[in-house]
């Protein structure tokens, strides 16, 4: 039997040698025709059902240590196969060989699958781990492909132990012969050729096995499993099952190609010869698993297309040659796994490793070793090492036999390499060619030297031809969507390229090798201060718990020589920003979850815990961004996002739950809110400390409140200070929320935080806005208006403060109107108002000052009456009787009311009256000592005045002299208050001088006033005077030329410039050198910062003011030094007034005097006549000088003379035009100046109402008639209008509700008049437009065709009928005496146009309710 086996072995080897020489010439048409013939002889079966082509099978690597013994087993099994293949029917073998050619037409035969099929494990054991060996129970020509079913065959029993020992001895002998015959490989390949009979027999034997593997017949599972279990143990006796009638034993290890033509399955291993060392090397390489190549895109590709490029050679020889080239040139990596519980294994990946690759202890190799060890342990002690290795090698073949159709997915950039440690990011060895150019070279890969490779693995340093790297191939089974994969390191090789391959964990994240974290981002360790070590390229991690960024940014370190330090810094900066962007993206995801959680109506306990966890992660992420790159955090507004996402929305949710009346546990919610606020307070305290440590600064050094510093700050410190300010604002907000949660109103702590934040960065408007909120909560309206204006007048304003100011001013307006109404009611109810000889006037402040109305009540004699030019003096005297606190409250209300009109620009017609009231109350307040207005409150008043001027300026006008009317009124109010303030300071300085003269200690310096001798009230007022002077120096265009002054009474109409001149005269006597002031710094000097400068730092209207630093000695008195600086600044300001282009002050006669032009007011000249004449003389001088210069310059030529004469004429015409204009202005001013004051002595007797008076006030008119003191004169045109309203609307049924009301009132008025005229009432008359009185209105139609004007003019003509003015009666004998007119008629109307016409004709006019109040009727 051994001789027979040797004969078969030699014959098979020689046969493969012949095929190797014939492989290059295997592409002839005759061979192609012969390849196509078997498909026609197989019962005319469909080609697509003959061979199943799923695409590619999976790859799997093999450990090197087990490969050698495995190859020896292969040789052992091959000998047995040849022994059984040598005996049989020759005719049947030839037919089977043709069928084998038919199988090979579909693609190259896969040597790995052939090897795997030959080496299935012999031990099955338990069913859940059994690997079935498929055998054929039917002839090849009777097998039919059945899709969707698994194929199983019955295996034969193994040979006896003696036969296997003899085969093993033959394998050892072959190894020895191989070592002796390495140099004679080519020669033996030519000489040693088997005979034709053996070739045909071997072809027949191989073809029978291949055909059975392709057709895939199914047998019973139980019997096949039992046979495999019996054959798994070597030497186990058993019955021999024969395949055919022949008594020859068939090979136990059949080859079946059920994967596809693209799987390149071979039929049998190559033969061995005694003299062919090269064939023996091919046989050894053939047994190694190798990488499979995809040769078909689909399982339905045409078989004819595949046959074009295939030579007509035996599949076994092709498989052997292909194994040879793979062993020499290719190495790959793959993975596979087994599935238990009795189910077949799926898609095991196989790969061939060369010696160098297998020597590496890669994770893939370790995985295969572990699998082999498990197989050994399952096999038991009776199984040898070879048996376990055979079982491992048979595993993929069994899988391929049991799989159905499938799809090969080729992801981009797939690498088949184990050069790295098995990680998914490992760099592949080089690109591979899946499809050759021209013909299908992949089909003939490894056949007769026709392989197509892009690179040589023996020369790895040589660059590949293509740079694109092929990704690892993954086979997707279409029968089962879930492909089981192993967990562990082998998972890295196939990181879920298709989405639902691993449905049990669709969110799987690939784990990196080593002790690193198994999650996408590392957990955050407790925040620490120490800075970690640096690696020379990236800055060290601020927190040791955070991973270094090197692995996240680059795959390999950059060479230090290729980049400059600037480029490295920029590169590190870019990488750091990428990390920060990643952190923000993670934070956005966390914030989205938190927002979704807070959007629920109720939050459970689990939701509270989840919310706390999300907030903690958010705080860590945001804090890390702030501490890593403060500039980036500022650009991304991380501070504000931190507060909004991690605190504000959660706090608002808790507050909403507290306000909900249906809340279940309000106390629990309040406790959680307080815990959240405490946590926020601790967090921001810690953040402030970390900012100082990280960016190396101290907050104490920047709490001086200076908006402009002498030394520029470092960039990081600047951003860190902004972040610190935001943290302080958050601290203040937390304190404010805590007070509201506890239902208390002690906002002192919150105010302290806001003030600290304001001192850090005064130009930011946010702290002022928060301080305004606290003022609103505590109902301090002046503070609220001040802080809102500060937030608007900041470098970065808070625009929402404008709406807040509007609401505040609207509320102030309502309160002011209520206060005014209350004052009038108190005055009207006073019992002795007439007994005091006082009379009321109805003159408004906006009326003409040259017109004075004296109203005399009919019940009083004239001797008891006096004159009055203002409002009721009762109110004036009442200001002095008020307490300082009440007066202060009234003044604040009036002040805010006036500024509300300036800000909203609504109701400006009454602004002069309100401004007069403000100035009166302010003047009285200044007289109190101590002043009820403190220094801080006075600064706020001056600041509000500055803001009013700043806010009312024209935005689009760039001219210096372009000022709006609102701006002039605001400037007039500010200057008026400033003049009262300066007037009070002048008086206090005189008092200080008198006090110093009376002091015996100061007899030596009687001429100078010491700063230390200032009275306390003066010290309170000096900061406000200094601040306003700074503003005037910064914005001279707003007050020079002086704006139009307000129409104020004499009591408060103070000339600003004259007052400043007096103040300058007294201020020159003050000695400000009591404490020396220095301009330059020194070691023993310290910077002197005034309190007003610190409080108003960052205020935009004051940014243009002089900001010169001042230094004093460290041992000096800072309070006196501050007053010395204020006096110095005021002296400089007063000197600047003298140095203006149009000077306002001048030093004449040893003192300062005002030279400012008189402001433009009604009834006053715009300037003195002398000033105008002086201006004209100066212009004449200029013209004369110009004429002299022009004659001198024009002497050079006649052309120049003519040009200059033309200019002279043009200038002369311009001067003449200006003179004419000035003459006209002077004429108007002279007329106004010559207009005498007019006094109207009004004794009301005739009352003339208009139509609206009867419609709206019929009852009041009836009361006037009942009083019997007045005569009611009704114009006939009024009666006609009432008839029209009463009768003309009767036919209009579509009239609205208001029209019907008017119609009804007009009807009642007509009935009232008719009833009264019928009764012959002596106090009721009717008057025509021509002045005819009627005692009856039975005939009330009047012809007015010749009359001019409208109905209002006719009504006014009725009033003029009672005005009989004669010049000899009202013209006085002296020019200084006023013109006195007597009036007994009063027009009663609400119509504004009619009132204006009446005033121009000197007709007294009042509305009916006001006249009733004055007349005390009803």
UniProtKB/Swiss-Prot annotation:
Give me the stretches of Basic and acidic residues compositional bias.
30-51, 64-84, 182-230, 336-347, 367-379, 387-402, 820-834
In which broad location class does this protein mainly occur, judging by the first location in its UniProt entry?
nucleus
Q: Where is the composition biased (Acidic residues)?
A: 302-312
Q: Where is this region: EJC-binding motif 2?
A: 132-152
Q: Which residues carry this modification: Phosphothreonine?
A: 470, 478
Where is region (EJC-binding motif 1) located?
39-59
* Segments of skewed composition (Low complexity): 257-271, 417-426, 436-445
Extent of Basic residues compositional bias: 278-293
Where does the record place the PINc domain? 1245-1396
Q: Which residues carry this modification: Phosphoserine?
A: 331, 483, 830, 869, 873
Cofactors, names only: Mn(2+)
Q: Which domain of life is it from?
A: Eukaryota
PANTHER family, alphabetized? SMG-7 SUPPRESSOR WITH MORPHOLOGICAL EFFECT ON GENITALIA PROTEIN 7, TELOMERASE-BINDING PROTEIN EST1A
What does this gene product do? Component of the telomerase ribonucleoprotein (RNP) complex that is essential for the replication of chromosome termini. May have a general role in telomere regulation. Promotes in vitro the ability of TERT to elongate telomeres. Overexpression induces telomere uncapping, chromosomal end-to-end fusions (telomeric DNA persists at the fusion points) and did not perturb TRF2 telomeric localization. Binds to the single-stranded 5'-(GTGTGG)(4)GTGT-3' telomeric DNA, but not to a telomerase RNA template component (TER). Plays a role in nonsense-mediated mRNA decay. Is thought to provide a link to the mRNA degradation machinery as it has endonuclease activity required to initiate NMD, and to serve as an adapter for UPF1 to protein phosphatase 2A (PP2A), thereby triggering UPF1 dephosphorylation. Degrades single-stranded RNA (ssRNA), but not ssDNA or dsRNA.
Oligomeric state and interaction partners are given as: May form homooligomers. Associated component of the telomerase holoenzyme complex. Interacts with TERT, independently of the telomerase RNA. Interacts with SMG1, SMG5, SMG7, UPF1, UPF2, UPF3B and the PP2A catalytic subunits. Also interacts with the exon junction complex (EJC) composed at least of CASC3, EIF4A3, MAGOH and RBM8A; required for the process of nonsense-mediated mRNA decay. Interacts with DHX34; the interaction is RNA-independent.
Q: What is this protein called?
A: Telomerase-binding protein EST1A
What organism does the record attribute this protein to? Mus musculus (Mouse)
């Amino acid at each position: 039997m051994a001789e027979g086996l040797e004969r078969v072995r030699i014959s098979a080897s020689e046969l493969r040698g012949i095929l190797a020489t014939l492989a290059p010439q295997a592409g002839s048409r005759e061979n192609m025709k012969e390849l196509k013939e078997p498909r026609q002889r197989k019962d005319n079966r469909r080609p697509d059902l003959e061979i199943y082509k799923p695409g590619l099978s999976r790859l799997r690597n093999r450990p090197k240590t087990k490969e050698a013994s495995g190859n020896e087993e292969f040789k052992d099994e091959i000998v047995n196969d040849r022994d059984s293949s040598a005996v049989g029917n020759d005719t049947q073998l030839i037919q089977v060989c043709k069928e084998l050619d038919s199988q090979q037409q579909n693609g190259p035969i896969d040597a790995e699958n052939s090897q795997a099929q030959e080496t299935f494990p012999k031990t099955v054991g338990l069913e859940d781990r059994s690997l079935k060996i498929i055998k054929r129970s039917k002839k090849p020509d009777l097998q039919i492909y059945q899709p969707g079913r698994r194929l199983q065959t019955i295996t034969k029993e193994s040979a006896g132990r003696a036969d296997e020992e003899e085969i093993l001895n033959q394998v050892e002998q072959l190894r020895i012969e191989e070592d002796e015959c390495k140099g004679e490989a080519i020669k033996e390949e030519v000489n040693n050729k088997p005979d034709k009979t053996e070739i045909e027999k071997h072809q027949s034997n191989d073809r029978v096995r291949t055909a059975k593997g392709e057709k895939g017949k199914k047998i019973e599972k139980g019997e096949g499993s039992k046979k495999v279990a019996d054959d798994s143990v070597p030497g186990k006796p058993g019955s021999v099952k024969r395949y055919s009638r022949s008594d020859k034993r068939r090979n136990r290890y059949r080859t079946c190609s059920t994967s596809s033509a693209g799987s390149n399955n071979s039929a049998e291993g190559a033969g061995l010869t005694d003299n062919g060392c090269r064939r023996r090397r091919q046989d050894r390489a053939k047994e190694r698993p190798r990488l499979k190549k995809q040769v078909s895109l689909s399982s339905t590709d045409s078989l004819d297309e595949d046959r074009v490029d295939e030579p007509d050679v035996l599949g076994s020889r092709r498989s052997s040659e292909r194994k040879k080239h793979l062993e020499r040139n290719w190495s790959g990596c793959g993975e596979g796994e087994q599935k238990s519980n009795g189910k077949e294994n799926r898609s095991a990946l196989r790969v061939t490793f060369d010696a160098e690759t297998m020597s590496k202890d890669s994770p893939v190799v370790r995985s295969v070793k572990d699998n082999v060890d498990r197989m050994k342990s399952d096999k038991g002690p009776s199984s040898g090492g070879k048996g376990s290795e055979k079982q491992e090698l048979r595993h993929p073949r069994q899988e391929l036999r049991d799989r159905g159709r499938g799809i090969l997915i080729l992801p981009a950039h797939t690498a088949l390499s184990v050069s790295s440690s098995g990680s998914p990011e490992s760099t592949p060895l080089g690109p591979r060619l899946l499809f050759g150019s021209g013909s299908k070279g992949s089909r003939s890969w490894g056949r007769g030297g026709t392989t197509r490779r892009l690179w040589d693995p023996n020369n790895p340093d040589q660059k590949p031809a293509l740079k694109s790297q092929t990704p690892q191939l993954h086979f997707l089974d279409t029968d089962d969507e879930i492909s089981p994969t192993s967990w562990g390191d082998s998972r890295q090789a196939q990181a879920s390229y298709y989405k639902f391959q691993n449905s049990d964990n669709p969110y799987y994240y690939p784990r990196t090798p080593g002790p690193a974290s198994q999650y996408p981002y590392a957990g955050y360790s407790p925040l620490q201060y120490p800075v970690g070590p640096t690696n020379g390229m990236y800055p060290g991690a601020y927190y040791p718990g955070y991973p270094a960024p090197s692995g996240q940014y680059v795959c390999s370190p950059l060479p230090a020589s290729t980049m400059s330090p600037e480029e490295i810094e920029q590169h590190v900066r870019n990488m750091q920003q990428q990390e920060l962007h990643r952190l923000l993206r993670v934070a956005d995801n966390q914030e989205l979850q938190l927002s979704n959680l807070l959007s629920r109506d109720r939050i459970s306990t689990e939701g509270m815990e989840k919310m706390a966890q999300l907030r903690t992660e958010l705080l860590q992420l945001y804090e890390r961004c702030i501490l890593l790159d403060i500039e980036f955090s500022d650009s991304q507004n991380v501070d504000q996002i931190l507060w909004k996402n991690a605190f504000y929305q959660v706090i608002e949710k808790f507050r909403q739950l507290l306000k909900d009346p249906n809340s279940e546990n309000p106390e629990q919610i309040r406790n959680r809110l307080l815990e959240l606020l405490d946590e926020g307070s601790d967090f921001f305290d810690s953040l402030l400390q970390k900012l100082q440590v990280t960016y190396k600064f101290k907050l104490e050094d920047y709490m001086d409140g200076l908006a402009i510093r002498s030394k520029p700050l470092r960039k990081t410190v600047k951003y860190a200070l902004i972040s610190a300010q935001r943290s302080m604002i958050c601290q203040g907000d937390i304190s404010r929320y805590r007070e509201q949660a506890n239902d208390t109103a002690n906002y002192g702590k919150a105010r302290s935080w806001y003030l600290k934040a304001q001192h850090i960065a005064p130009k930011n408007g946010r702290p002022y806005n928060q301080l305004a909120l606290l003022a609103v909560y505590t109902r301090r309206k002046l503070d609220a208006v001040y802080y809102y204006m500060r937030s608007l007048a900041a470098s970065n304003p808070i625009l929402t403060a404008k709406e807040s100011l509007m609401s505040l001013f609207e509320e102030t307006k309502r309160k002011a109107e209520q206060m005014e109404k209350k004052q009038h009611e108190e005055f009207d109810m006073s019992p002795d108002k007439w007994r005091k000889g006082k009379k009321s006037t109805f003159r408004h402040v906006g009326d003409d000052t040259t017109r004075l109305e004296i109203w005399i009540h009919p019940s009083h004699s004239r001797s008891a009456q006096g004159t009055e030019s203002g409002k009721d003096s009762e109110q004036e005297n009442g200001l002095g009787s008020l307490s300082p606190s009440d007066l202060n409250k009234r003044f604040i209300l009036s002040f805010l009311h006036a500024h509300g009109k300036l800000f909203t620009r609504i109701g400006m017609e009454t602004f002069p009256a309100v401004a007069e009231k403000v100035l009166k109350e302010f003047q009285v307040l200044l007289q109190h000592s101590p002043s009820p207005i403190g220094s801080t409150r006075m600064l706020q008043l001056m600041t509000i005045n500055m803001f009013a001027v700043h806010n009312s300026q024209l935005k689009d006008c760039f001219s210096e002299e372009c000022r709006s009317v609102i701006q002039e009124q605001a400037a007039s109010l500010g200057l008026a208050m400033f003049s009262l303030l300066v007037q009070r300071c002048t008086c206090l300085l005189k008092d200080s001088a008198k006090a110093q003269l009376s002091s015996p200690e100061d007899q030596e310096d009687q001429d100078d006033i010491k700063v230390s001798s200032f009275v306390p009230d003066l010290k309170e007022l000096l900061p406000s005077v200094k601040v306003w002077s700074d503003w005037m120096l910064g914005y001279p265009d707003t007050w020079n030329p002086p704006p139009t002054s307000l129409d104020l009474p004499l009591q408060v109409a103070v000339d600003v410039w004259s007052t400043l001149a007096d103040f300058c005269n007294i201020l020159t006597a003050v000695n400000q050198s009591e404490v020396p002031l220095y301009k330059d710094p020194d070691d023993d000097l310290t910077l002197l910062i005034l309190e007003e400068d610190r409080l108003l730092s960052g205020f935009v209207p004051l940014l243009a003011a002089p900001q010169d630093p001042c230094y004093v000695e460290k041992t000096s008195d800072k309070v006196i030094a501050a007053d010395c600086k204020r006096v110095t600044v005021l002296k400089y300001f007063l000197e600047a007034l003298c140095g203006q282009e149009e000077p306002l002050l001048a030093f004449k006669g040893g003192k300062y005097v005002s030279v400012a032009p008189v402001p433009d007011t009604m009834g006053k000249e715009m300037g003195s006549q002398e000033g105008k004449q002086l201006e004209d003389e100066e212009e004449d001088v200029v013209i004369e000088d110009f004429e002299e210069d022009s004659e001198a310059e024009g002497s050079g030529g006649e052309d120049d003379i003519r040009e200059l004469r033309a200019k002279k004429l043009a200038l002369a015409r311009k001067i003449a035009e200006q003179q004419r204009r000035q003459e006209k202005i002077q004429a108007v001013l002279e007329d106004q100046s010559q207009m005498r004051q007019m006094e109207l002595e009004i004794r009301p007797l005739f009352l003339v109402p208009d139509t609206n008076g009867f419609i709206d006030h019929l009852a009041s008119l009836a009361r006037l008639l009942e009083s019997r003191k007045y005569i009611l004169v009704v114009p006939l045109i009024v009666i006609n209008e009432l008839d029209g309203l009463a009768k003309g609307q009767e036919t209009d049924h579509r009239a609205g509700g208001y029209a019907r009301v008017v119609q009804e009132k007009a009807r009642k008025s007509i009935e009232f008049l008719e009833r009264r005229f019928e009764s012959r009432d002596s106090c009721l008359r009717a008057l025509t437009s021509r002045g005819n009185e009627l005692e009856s209105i039975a005939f009330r139609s009047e012809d007015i065709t010749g009359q001019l004007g409208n109905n209002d003019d006719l009504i006014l003509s009725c009033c003029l009928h009672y005005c009989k003015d004669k010049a000899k009666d009202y013209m006085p004998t002296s020019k200084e005496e006023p013109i006195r007119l007597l009036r007994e008629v009063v027009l009663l109307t609400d119509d504004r146009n009619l009132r204006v016409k009446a005033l121009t004709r000197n007709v007294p006019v009042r509305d009916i309710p006001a006249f009733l109040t004055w007349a005390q009727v009803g």
